[in-house]
Regions:
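Short helix-loop "hinge" at the ATP-lid/N-box region of the Bergerat-fold HATPase_c
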Residues: 108-109
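Short alpha-helical segment of the dimerization/phosphotransfer core of two-component systems
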Residues: 24-29
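Conserved micro-motifs of the catalytic ATP-binding
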Residues: 44-49, 89-92
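Short conserved segment of the HATPase_c
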Residues: 143-155
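A conserved beta-strand-to-alpha-helix junction within the catalytic ATP-binding
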Residues: 50-65, 98
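Short conserved segments within the C-terminal catalytic ATPase subdomain
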Residues: 70-81
Length: 196
């Protein structure tokens, strides 16, 4: 890029666009390497959680906010109304939990077409005081009945046309297990997906 720029054959717009692609691809590759390292740590029992008392709602809000602009840029609707209820503090690793939130929201946006909707909500009931549910539903392509049981397996990708390593949900599932939680997925081909 530098040689072309020095010779004056590359206009500013093309240069900026090229740099944008380079930065985007660098981020994507870094993300894949981080997922592989996380999965390796989980498999070898070396993943350490830094558990602390945290506001789970604030962590989820940050994840939604982080992806909101991307949704707008891609012509998708990311819907989330922050609950007005005060939630009890949770004891967990805020960075790892946020990683799960970002992974699931990212997948929902990735597999939802332009004009589609990704809706997120946080559910807490005093009837189940030890459970906080975060539900993310999309109007994307969905997952076939054949593929659904396999989506949390490492390197499994139901849809080969969309980028990614195929280990994000496997890592997210393991992180939730380490927090005594679960990652439940309901889906149907052509009807979207719900992750709780």
């Amino acid at each position: 890029t530098m040689q072309l720029s020095e010779r004056g054959k590359l206009d500013r717009k093309t240069f900026d666009r090229g740099m944008g692609v380079i930065i985007s691809e660098s981020s994507r590759l870094t993300s894949i390497v981080e997922e592989l390292l996380d999965f390796s740590r989980i498999q070898s029992g070396r993943m350490k959680l830094i558990k602390e008392k945290l506001d789970i709602l604030a962590e989820f809000d940050d994840a939604v906010y982080f992806l909101k602009e991307r949704a707008v840029t891609e012509g998708k609707h990311l819907l989330y109304d922050e609950p007005e209820v005060v939630y009890p503090a949770v004891y967990g690793d805020k960075n790892r939990l946020k990683q799960v939130f970002l992974n699931v929201l990212d997948n929902a946006l990735k597999y939802t077409p332009k004009g589609g909707v990704v809706a997120a909500q946080v559910i807490y009931s005093k009837d189940e005081p030890d459970i906080i549910k975060i539900v993310i539903t999309d109007t994307g392509c969905g997952i076939s009945a054949e593929d659904l049981p396999k989506v949390k397996e490492k390197f499994y990708k139901a849809n080969q046309t969309v980028g990614g390593s195929g280990i994000g949900l496997a890592v997210a599932d393991e992180i939730m297990n380490l927090h005594n939680g679960s990652l439940d997925i309901e889906s149907g081909e052509g009807v979207g997906t719900t992750v709780t």
